[in-house]
Amino acid sequence: MAPRLQLEKAAWRWAEAVRPEDITHEHIELAYRIAVSACKRGACRRNCKGNPNCLVGIGEQSWLGEIDENTFHNIDDPNSERRDKNTFVGLTNLGATCYVNTFLQVWFHNLELRRALYRFQNSRAEGHNTDSDYEPRTICEHLQYLFALLQNSNRRYIDPSGLVKALGLDTGQQQDAQEFSKLFLSLLEDTLSKQKDPNLQNVIQQQFCGQFSYVTVCNKCGRESPLPSRFYELELNIQGHKNLTECVTEFLKEEKLDGDNRYYCESCQSKQNATRRIKLQSLPRTLNFQLMRFVFDRQSGHKKKLNTFISFPEVLDMEPFLEGREEKCTYELSAVLIHRGVSAYSGHYIAHVRDAHTNDWYKFNDEEIEKMEGKKLQLGIEEDIAETAKSQTRKPKCSKGYHCSRNAYMLVYKQQTEEINQTESPVDVPAFLQKLVEQDNRKFEEWCSEMSDMRKQSVDKGKAKHEEVKELYELLPAEDGQSYEFVPLEWLKKWLDDSTAIKEIDNSQFLCTHGKLHPDKIGEAKRISLKAADLLFSRYGGGPRLDRSSLCRDCVTQRCRVIRLKNQLNEDYREVTNLAKSALKSEESGFWIGKASLRSWRQLALDQLEEDEEETKHNNSKINGEKSSPGTKADGVKGDSEDGDGEEMKNFNEDILCYHGGLSILENDRRLVSAEVWNKLRMYFPKAPEFTQDHDPCQQCMRLEREGKENEALNRMMANEQKSSLLNLFQEKNRPTLQKWPQDTDILYIVPLYFVEEWKKFIRRPAKGNPVSNVGNSILLCPHGGFMFTYDSMLQGDAQHIALLWPAEWEVISKMFLVDQVISICRIHDKTQDNGNVQYQTHPDLCRECREGFIFQQQRDMREYTQATVYVRKVIDKKRMIKESAPEFSVSGSDVEDEKEEPKLDGEKDPDFSQTEGGAKRQKLNDTVSLPTAVVTTTSKSGIRRSTRHRKLRGEKALIVSANQTLKDLKIQIMHAFSVAPFDQNLSIDGRCLKDDSATLGSLGVIPESIICLKADEPIADYAAMDDVYQVCMPEEGFKGTGLLGH
């Protein structure tokens, strides 16, 4: 099928030769494309929107032919949630609770612990009525019920949210898994100790509790001092070790106590050098080794993960580590807990657990459980996950019977026994718990039944829809000569899209202002047979129904008229263009027309026609209940001129109107055209402003122009006179300075630097600005009339507010400008002393009270600022840490020179370099006096004024800070600006290091406009740690506020 635009042109091609009053019904059907051939199936890749008869590519492909029943299923098979035979049950990850799930699976597979928990007295569960849901309350009740579900539930995985909620854990915050294990076992032991059953009271100690002693031996007298202690796991340092044996050996090694760490011996009654070691005395049935992978890094101030490979045996002989014990003490590996990830603040926890009955190994990964092939533990896949491009370490070879891991953080060993005892025997679920499990299983089966019924309903519904589509789709095409109707294309697509609900047919969107089918909407509608329309409307309802009588003659006539007008416009445009090229005859009367209007008149005429059409559409939208979209021509927004140079015209010939509504005095913006040209243009713009050749320009504009030229001439004369009289001041040559007082005068005059800068601007551009008429020296005085600056302060920072004048210059200024207050500084020689001591006196005198207040205000602003700017300069080496850029010479304070690009430092480029404008700030003198913004300047000994405005350098960025924010907050800002982690930042200011992260910037002496040097440490080998910087910056609260701490 031809493209949409070609169909559009073909539908209206007849309008060029047919007058509006000669339109027939055949022309109307051509405009609505009734006779356009329908597309055959397979001929179109997508539906032809320009063809109302094209019914291909609207979603029918999926319904024609045979359809598999599975395609009708919009609900997952509930049996996929069912537990397979001889498999274990998983646990749902509630967000970041994978660390909880791993320990629950390990403790569930401890048969003695599970058997003991089943004996826990639970009167609420024993007396529970199965008509209502059981809700455990205590931790033991939750764990007991959870273990029963893990053992006999029909579900593939269960939800541990009851236990997690009872513990008060934050499901979105990953916590320290090792700390959770300790706290939970401690809480469980405390709860079970209150039971009457002695076996239940001591089950945690029997399973997990061992004993060792800290033995201290005095080097002088040899006295041993044992200090017994219990343990539930052995925390082993892995740094610098390769296998578990080395870690245990280091744990038990002897430690020397000397120097300040000497031991007080009760026998010697004094501090003596001594040795201390840990002596294992008894080991539990379940021996837990906590491998200390997550350690505190003193350099960064945060935790980090040690990705050290540690090998460990399947069978562990602990006899060599027990003193005075000859019986066998052999343990067999029963669980390995894994942390996937390279960071201590993120990652994923899984558990490898050995089944006590079959000795098969299983991997527990939240809801997913995978049985290992064979009888051996397989960790290879888990070790590959943590590898990164920067941290690949070759895995060491393991001997037979050993395993190696860089991610294992806990090893669980079970004591071997020679005979088969109750540990290997099945653990039966008590009757009262089994009843609760069966209640949950019934609920699960009911859910599965409901889901199956819903799946069957969706299949039945899909089959019915399939038959309906096959029946109706064949009836949709309207044959030639048959009655037909129009329905929305989008509705047909939704009818054929099984995923969306089908609404009633809505044809109101297609209505024109005459209540019929708008010809512009034909691309959004499809022509179907009357029989198909009757069936669709009877089943789905809706309206209004649009048939052959709904074709709008009025709209077609209006469009025909517009098309003919556009064609006539093109002919007139060519004629006007040719006539405008001819020169106007001397005896011929002409008309003034704007050059922009002459360039754009065709587009303006087209816009008027389109506005009429858009107005019709706008009214049509109101009838259909639609809103006109902003930015359309109906809203008065016109497009760019295709004939002009892009200028936007509101009305024709208004570009030669002045502000007063008369003929503009700008002759370059208008030209004369002949009466023939003007008459043709006036046909399209009857209301356009008309000016004949002899029409006078606006008198008010001419008077203002004369006055402006006179004022401009006066300003130029004034500027030349002032410049010649004060040439050195303008060029900043031969300027007096306070550092080296001129020898030929004892008095200098003072004016605000702001006055000098504004005066220079006028001298440079006298025609663009207003002349400076007065010298506002009162701005340098306090409310009492006293001067605000001392001689010493004007040598330093206060030089940014003043300019010094020679007496001759002051005499000129006092004549040319109005001066509100004379300010001078005198040099006074002390003749009473032989050393020629010199004093300096200002007039008016210094107001000491206001001066002290001003200094106090400055100091307070330095300490209590908000939203101030500081500059962070990233440096590469130590030389650049202390290097400061030389001040840049400024021969004048013009705006042009302020905009010049600043010179860059040579040396190594930094990718974080950016250049932005610097600026000086207004400084307040007190509550009523303020100094205007000016370029900060100092005066050198040579008399050349140099700018001290901040110059941004390579590798420097401006940050907005407040005095009360901490150094840590600043480091986070720097992290965002430079992509340098806070723990890799070394900050200094004026050679002084900034170290205390908790200190405020005000207390550290960081003031507005400070330059802070950033020296970044070498990037860490593990780039993925940057992803956890945000978590690092959050305060670590652990399990504060949870049930694990008794809250």
Curated annotation (Swiss-Prot):
Ubiquitin-like domain sequence ranges: 961-1012
Coiled-coil segments on the chain, per record: none
The keyword Nucleotide-binding belongs to this UniProt entry's keyword annotation: no
Gene3D superfamilies reported in the protein's UniProt record: Cysteine proteinases, DUSP-like, Phosphatidylinositol 3-kinase Catalytic Subunit, Chain A, domain 1
DUSP domain segment(s): 457-551, 567-697, 717-830
Pfam families membership: DUSP (PF06337), UCH (PF00443)
Catalyzed reaction equations: Thiol-dependent hydrolysis of ester, thioester, amide, peptide and isopeptide bonds formed by the C-terminal Gly of ubiquitin (a 76-residue protein attached to proteins as an intracellular targeting signal)
Region (Disordered): 609-647, 887-928
EC numbers for this chain: 3.4.19.12
GO cellular component: cytosol; nucleus
List of catalytic residues: 98 (nucleophile), 348 (proton acceptor)
Compositional bias ranges of the Basic and acidic residues kind: 635-647, 901-912
Keyword line: Cytoplasm, Hydrolase, Nucleus, Protease, Repeat, Thiol protease, Ubl conjugation pathway
Database matches in PANTHER family: UBIQUITIN CARBOXYL-TERMINAL HYDROLASE, UBIQUITIN CARBOXYL-TERMINAL HYDROLASE 48
Role, per record: Recognizes and hydrolyzes the peptide bond at the C-terminal Gly of ubiquitin. Involved in the processing of poly-ubiquitin precursors as well as that of ubiquitinated proteins.
Designated name of the protein: Ubiquitin carboxyl-terminal hydrolase 48
Species annotation: Danio rerio (Zebrafish)
Gene it is expressed from: usp48
